[in-house]
């Protein structure tokens, strides 16, 4: 089967297409596989919490501040909740919002970045670039915290849907900025100019040329934005800006802070949710490293050394067989 190089990232195109090649390239990275395994384990853990928990996570009738035991694997908190049950239930909102923020934020960054790049040096580009610059200068989480503090003053707490769209609407600026730069670079390439000369529309150029050539960046931007969504979600509930009646890892940290768990030595109350949040972000970061290695050949030094060692072993094995 004939194969050709694919765009600026030198992917080989076969019958499976660029998406398959990206997935295959990422899967071949050991660090990315580790991140995928960790993420799958956390997702399974969170899905189990939807259908099963040892106890009702909202039940407060247990003895308070019990250390971990066979009856309560992670003990109980200062309010009589079973910590392990809350940990099970609290994972799905965090991961779900993180993925949703990553998806929506990436779509916004693609739309704004490609539009600004295709219409560079126009009024539309200047307006979009100015808006992007504002969101780059002012941290999105700070904006959400200010809005949440104002709404809290009027007794309104942020729900999951509001938090999701608030994070997505403030987490797209970095990706948009980079996407615009990539589009400007691609516009000067010969195959893009050739497609324009033969009459291909801008929509066709976007879906047939620009997006396929930027798949690694789009995937990387998704995980980067998802990390922002998870950390932003946690901060919002940790500072009490969200609805505190909802059980998630952020509210667990909020109540542990209010109960002075650290000062009282109740480590089982705050370490498990903090560890799980860090583990999710760590898995996303590992996958992102794998994507970067696929997209940037300069980061494949470790792989080159590995393949050289394998080649040397194969040569030595061949010499042994020949001499034998």
Specify the residue positions occupied by each region the protein language model found.
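Transmembrane alpha-helices
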Residues: 92-106, 203-234
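Glycine-rich helix-loop "coupling/hinge" segments at transmembrane-helix boundaries
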Residues: 136, 149, 224-225, 232-271, ...
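Short membrane-interfacial helix/loop motifs at transmembrane-helix boundaries
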Residues: 23, 47-85
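Short helix-to-coil transition segments within interhelical loops
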Residues: 76-81, 119, 194-204, 208-213
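N-terminal signal-anchor/first transmembrane alpha helix
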Residues: 2-58, 128-131, 135, 204, ...
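C-terminal transmembrane helix and the adjacent membrane-cytosol boundary/short C-terminal tail
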Residues: 155, 170, 223, 266-324
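Generic hydrophobic transmembrane alpha-helix motif, especially the helices
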Residues: 73, 77, 83, 104, ...
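Transmembrane alpha-helix signature in integral membrane proteins
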Residues: 83-116, 280
């Amino acid at each position: 089967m004939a194969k050709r190089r694919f765009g600026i990232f030198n992917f080989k195109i076969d019958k499976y297409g660029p998406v398959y090649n990206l997935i295959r390239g990422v899967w071949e990275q050991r660090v990315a596989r580790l991140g995928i395994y960790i993420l799958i384990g956390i997702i399974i853990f969170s899905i189990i919490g939807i259908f099963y928990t040892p106890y009702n996570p909202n039940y407060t009738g247990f003895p308070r501040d019990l250390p971990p035991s066979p009856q309560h694997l992670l003990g109980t908190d200062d309010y009589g909740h079973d910590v392990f049950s809350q940990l099970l239930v609290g994972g799905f909102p965090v991961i779900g919002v993180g993925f949703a923020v990553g998806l929506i934020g990436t779509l916004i960054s693609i739309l704004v970045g490609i539009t600004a790049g295709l219409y560079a040096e126009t009024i539309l580009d200047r307006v979009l670039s100015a808006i992007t610059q504002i969101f780059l200068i002012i941290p999105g989480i700070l904006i959400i915290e200010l809005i949440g503090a104002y709404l809290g003053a009027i007794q309104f707490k942020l729900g999951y849907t509001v938090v999701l769209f608030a994070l997505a609407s403030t987490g797209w600026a970095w990706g948009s900025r980079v996407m615009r730069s990539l589009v400007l670079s691609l516009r000067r390439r010969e195959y893009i100019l050739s497609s324009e000369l033969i009459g291909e529309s801008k929509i066709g150029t976007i879906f047939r040329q620009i997006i396929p050539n930027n798949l690694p960046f789009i995937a990387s931007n998704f995980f980067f934005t998802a990390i922002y969504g998870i950390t932003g979600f946690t901060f919002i509930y940790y500072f009490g800006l969200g609805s505190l009646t909802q059980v998630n890892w952020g509210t667990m940290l909020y109540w542990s802070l209010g109960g002075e768990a650290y000062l009282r030595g109740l480590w089982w109350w705050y370490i498990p949710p903090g560890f799980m949040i860090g583990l999710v972000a760590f898995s996303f970061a590992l996958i992102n490293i794998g994507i970067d290695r696929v997209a940037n050949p300069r980061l494949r030094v470790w792989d080159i050394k590995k393949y050289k060692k394998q080649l040397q072993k194969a040569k030595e094995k061949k010499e042994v067989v020949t001499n034998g």
